[in-house]
Amino acid sequence: MANDFLFTSESVSEGHPDKVADQISDAILDAIFKQDPKSRVAAETLCNTGLVVLAGEITTNAHVDYIQVARDTLKRIGYDNTEYGIDYKGCAVLVAYDKQSNDIAQGVDHASDDHLNTGAGDQGLMFGYACNETPELMPAPIYYAHRLVERQAQLRKDGRLPFLRPDAKSQITMHYVDGKPHSIDTVVLSSQHSPEMSNGLTMKPAFIEAVMEDIIKPVCPKEWLTADTKYLINPTGRFVVGGPQGDCGLTGRKIIVDTYGGACPHGGGAFSGKDPSKVDRSAAYAARYVAKNIVAAGLARQCQIQVAYAIGVAKPMNVTVYTEGTGVIPDDKIAELVHELFDLRPKGIIQMLDLLRPIYEKTAAYGHFGREEPEFTWERTDKAQALRAAAGL
């Protein structure tokens, strides 16, 4: 990639229909894990006007009121009024879960008497990434796109901007100079709102001003906002119909929002609703953990990790390190250190990151990476010093 360029990432709020589905799926997973952390869960959700459908495969000894979990999640997000197209109190919730296939279970549960050699729950490839663009070691565009919609929800919920409604989308276009963030070229923020904030199809100035002054300016670093920065606030105008009424929401349709905003490749597997025996989720978390520790250790300014698995096999097919020329030692040497210091077998990952806990609903909006909450164990940099020592730095 050229040293001077524009790069864009987007995020969506917790009230976006696809994120509603993700949060319900992960709320189901958490409710099950509170009772039975050994459960196998693949919980999918569809949400539309007045309707939630729960389907997938679950094998558990837990007894969970799935319908109530779905309603509670809608309530927490803010879908508490029929005017919003779905109301937690009166919407229909259909449940259609099966058990995990025995053919899959035999490869996952009985691959070896040694539990650390339990096989991966599926084949696939996963990526992790870190860079030094932000203190959280995340790419700047996706990080600040998340913070915009997160603040939109905060101001909506605490009543400071009561005319906001749950659905929202953000987008940041960053101008890079010499390969580093230099300024924000464009900010896009579209927020669902109550009807009185528009004149026909045009937004009222009070809405534009509130979004600018109370959401965009407090979030975006002042030094990156210039006289040339463009602001597009509800650029199509009126946005009253939104959420599951505006679009059908499905689990797993925001995988780039969930990860790095397009700054690195994606293996294609979604996260939400999946227990950590599914390497789509757990190995992607582990790859982030590895990449973040490499950057935190000063071994590279940016780092991409690829891992791949075969179903029923514990050892990864490959662990590949790519630092895009920013490494202080060769990439293959960093890969050797990764093999020495990180156990990337599925059970090793689960132990290393303590993943058999009800921690997942919080991950399902505003990004799985680049957050400092204690539950996000894959964001720790506790291996950085060991990496530096092993590298001789």
Curated annotation (Swiss-Prot):
Q: Where in the cell is it found?
A: Cytoplasm
Q: Which cofactor does it need?
A: Mg(2+); K(+)
Write out the GO MF terms: ATP binding; magnesium ion binding; methionine adenosyltransferase activity
Query: E.C. number, please?
Result: 2.5.1.6
Q: Which residues bind L-methionine?
A: 57, 100, 247, 278
Region Flexible loop: list its residue ranges. 100-110
Q: Name one GO cellular component term.
A: cytoplasm
Q: Which residues cross the membrane?
A: none
**What HAMAP family does this protein's entry cite?**
S_AdoMet_synth1
Give the family, as the similarity comment puts it. Belongs to the AdoMet synthase family.
Output this protein's name. S-adenosylmethionine synthase
Organism source for this protein? Albidiferax ferrireducens (strain ATCC BAA-621 / DSM 15236 / T118) (Rhodoferax ferrireducens)
